[in-house]
Amino acid sequence: VSNIVWGNQNLSEFLKLLKQECCDGIELAPSLIWKEPILSSSEERSSLKKKILSSGLKLVGFHSLLFSRPDLQLFKSEISRKNTITYLKDLIKLCSELGGSQLIFGSPNNRLLHGKKYEECLKQSYDDFLNLAEYCFEKKVFFCIEPLGKNLSEFIVSMSEGGELVRKVNHPNFRLHLDTKTVFTTKEDMSFIVDKYGDLIQHVHISDDDLNEPGSINKEHVNISKFLKKIEYK
C-alpha cells in the first residue's frame, strides 16, 4: 500500500492501520516523507527504517520518484539528463539503505520528449537505463519502468513498448512494472502481454481511475489476477 493515500501526516498511525489490515509492506513516495529525500540525514533514514520494521512491515520500495522535481527532465538537455540520472541514483541508494527492493519509474512529466523524435529518445534511454540498472545491481535493488497511457505520457505508453525496452536494455536489474489502470487505458490484451513479457514483470500496482477503489470503475481486476497467477507473481 502506498503512503500517497495518507500523505505525510501521522505515518506511525498509518503503519499501524496497515498491519491491522494484514498488509505485509508499504511502498513510499519519498517526497511525502521528506521535502528533499536525498538530503535526509543518516539519523532520519535509520529512524524511518526502524519505524517501518517495528510496525511489522517491510519497505517494498519507492514510486513517484520525481514528483517534487519537475526540473529534472530525461530528454530535455544533456545537463538535465545527467542531473536526472544522478538524482535517481541518489534515490536508489536511499531505497537500498531503507531496505527497499525496487523503484518504480513512472514520473510522466519528467520523461517528456521536448520536441525530439521518439526513436532518438528511445535510443538515448538504453544507455541511461543500463547505467541505472548497473548501479541497482550494486545496491541490490531493481529499477522498473512503468508504462503509462498516451493520456499521461509521451514515452513508453504501452506494456508492449515497456517490454521491448526492458529486453533491449537486457540487464537483470532493469525490469517491467504493470499498473492495472494503464492496462485498462491502453486496452492491451493481457493474455498477449503475459505470454510475451510475463517473465519481465517485477512489480504490480492494483489501481483504478482517479485513485478510486480497485474494481469500482473497471471490472477486469479479477481477470488480471488470473493472468498474474499464471506467471506465479507474488
Where are these predicted regions, by residue range?
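Active-site-proximal loop/turn and secondary-structure-junction residues that shape catalytic pockets
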Residues: 5-7, 30-32, 65-68, 109-111, ...
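Well-ordered, non-membrane alpha-helical segments in soluble/globular domains
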Residues: 45, 125, 221-224
